[in-house]
UniProtKB/Swiss-Prot annotation:
One of its GO terms (biological process) is pantothenate biosynthetic process. Keywords: Cytoplasm, Magnesium, Metal-binding, Pantothenate biosynthesis, Transferase. 3-methyl-2-oxobutanoate binds at D45, S46, D84, K112. Homodecamer; pentamer of dimers. The keyword Cell membrane does not apply. The gene is panB. Binds 1 Mg(2+) ion per subunit. This is 3-methyl-2-oxobutanoate hydroxymethyltransferase. Pathway: Cofactor biosynthesis; (R)-pantothenate biosynthesis; (R)-pantoate from 3-methyl-2-oxobutanoate: step 1/2. Gene3D superfamilies: Phosphoenolpyruvate-binding domains. The keyword rRNA processing does not apply.
Length: 263
């Protein structure tokens, strides 16, 4: 199997073919996802909550991300692998470059960073130094203390600000964008305005791709279950079938449905 590249996702956007992505944190699940056909995975700082048991993503370190990136890469050698730069790992462009080098050497193909136009110089510096960048707008979990909790973003006038941020990130060189917990109407505007692929989570079925935290997809999340989550394991019966069902529902536009979306 050939390695999956950003060019393939760009082609999916052009041909209006939805694609499914998922978080992965270890060898075994990465291999399972790859075996069933998921070719894009994220080593997310969500591991702080799902793996380490913290109440936010803030305690996650670059070393944590690198450790899990190495494990996932061994399980899915041909996937397009995104890795988060965690909280305060990219406060300056220079710091971002140093930490991106660590996770890229661990096996990442691209780094994901949270934030808007203030990251333009960082995105430029990374891309000029051959580090592909995925932006992340909307509900950015590293900003939970600013937001006052995990709340939908981009309603009202904030929607135009988010769209402007998305365009600024693309112009700076970002090659992917994750949109989290925003109204469907805004997600549609952003997806149509950008030439780069947009991956949604809690953004309706109007984005080019979808991502879910694997624990949400399997119904094993402790505590609060996000509105946009769906337990595919409950219907499918086993993990492999659940992965296939998730992919099929994303590709057909069945998931996420209205019950998983915000307005």
């Amino acid at each position: 199997m050939k390695p999956t590249t950003i060019s393939l996702l760009q082609k999916c956007k052009q041909e209006k073919k939805r694609f499914a992505t998922i978080t992965a944190y270890d060898y075994s699940f990465a291999k399972l996802f790859a075996d069933e056909g998921i070719n894009v995975m994220l080593v997310g700082d969500s591991l702080g909550m799902t793996i380490q048991g913290h109440d936010s993503t803030l305690p996650v370190t670059v070393e944590d991300i690198a450790y899990h990136t190495r494990a996932v890469r061994r399980g899915a050698p041909n996937c397009l692998l995104l890795s988060d730069l965690p909280f305060m790992a990219y406060a300056t462009p220079e710091q971002a470059c140093e930490n991106a080098a660590i996770v890229m050497r661990a096996g990442a193909n691209m780094v994901k960073i949270e934030g808007g136009a203030w990251l333009v110089d960082t995105v430029k510096m990374l891309t000029e130094r051959a580090v592909p960048v995925c932006g992340h707008l909307g509900l950015t979990p590293q900003s939970v203390n600013i937001f006052g909790g995990y709340k939908i973003q981009g309603r009202g006038d904030a929607g135009q600000v988010l769209l402007d941020d998305a365009l600024a990130l693309e112009a700076a060189g970002a090659q992917l964008l994750v949109l989290e917990c925003v109204p469907v109407e805004l997600a549609k505007r952003v997806t149509e305005a950008l030439s780069i692929p947009v991956i949604g989570i809690g953004a309706g079925n109007v984005t080019d791709g979808q991502i879910l935290v694997m624990h949400d997809a399997f119904g094993i999340t402790g505590g609060h279950i996000p509105k946009f989550a769906k337990n595919f394991l409950a219907e499918a019966g086993d993990m492999r079938a659940a992965v296939r069902q998730y992919m099929a529902e994303v590709e057909s536009g069945v998931y996420p449905g209205e019950e998983h979306s915000f307005h």
